[in-house]
């Protein structure tokens, strides 16, 4: 969940440098290579969404790149854990096969699947929540992707209006966006 600001602030950097920063951030609490790779895959999709690719294209392009980027150790041994994601066919997986129990691979798959099988912010987040189990984590990850894909103006206004300290949050987001666009 903390990866999104790193990608937003560093999306113009080279992909290897951006991934290095993302992996460093992951290691603070989740040092296993599998967790770092999950964060890297999330970052690659986010970066592609930022460059105005539609969700399906952003996902496929990111996975194509990931198959080439994660060839060396320690990533090579972890690739098998991300098979469904890396094949680029996650949207075809039936809902009953999508896990949402908080395990890093399942969380990433569930969030990405929610994005790929819906067409707007609201439906993406609700689909993620309705998978159950670790719904708040999956919805936060999916919501980050959907926010980049569809923009703040597509977030239901009643959801924004319900935020505690809404004005402070919107001000912080505006300042962050200005900093990230430099």
Annotate each predicted stretch with a short phrase:
Residues 119-121, 181-182:
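Generic structural signal for short, solvent-exposed loop/turn connectors between secondary structure elements
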Residues 1-118, 124-130, 145:
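Amphipathic alpha-helical interface segments
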Residues 1-2, 135-148:
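Conserved phosphate/anionic-ligand binding catalytic regions in large, soluble enzymes, centered on
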Residues 121-125, 137, 156-158:
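Extended hydrophobic-aromatic, low-complexity segments
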Residues 128, 139-142, 159, 163:
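Active-site proximal loops enriched in glycine and acidic residues that flank catalytic Cys/His/Asp
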């Amino acid at each position: 969940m903390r990866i999104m600001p790193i990608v937003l602030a560093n999306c113009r950097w080279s992909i290897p440098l951006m991934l290095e920063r993302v992996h460093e951030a992951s290691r603070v609490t989740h040092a296993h290579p599998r967790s770092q790779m999950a964060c890297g895959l999330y970052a690659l999709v986010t970066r592609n969404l930022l460059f105005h690719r539609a969700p399906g294209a952003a996902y496929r392009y990111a996975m194509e790149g990931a198959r080439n980027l994660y060839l060396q150790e320690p990533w090579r041994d972890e690739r098998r854990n991300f098979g469904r994601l890396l094949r680029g066919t996650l949207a075809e997986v039936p809902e009953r096969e999508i896990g949402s129990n908080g395990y890093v691979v399942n969380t990433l798959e569930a969030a990405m699947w929610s994005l790929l099988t819906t067409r707007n912010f609201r439906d993406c987040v609700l689909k993620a929540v309705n998978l159950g189990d670790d719904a708040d984590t999956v919805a936060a990850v999916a919501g980050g992707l959907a926010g980049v894909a569809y923009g703040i103006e597509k977030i239901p206004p009643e959801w924004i209006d319900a935020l505690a300290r809404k004005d402070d949050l919107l001000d912080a987001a505006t300042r962050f966006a200005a900093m990230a666009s430099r």
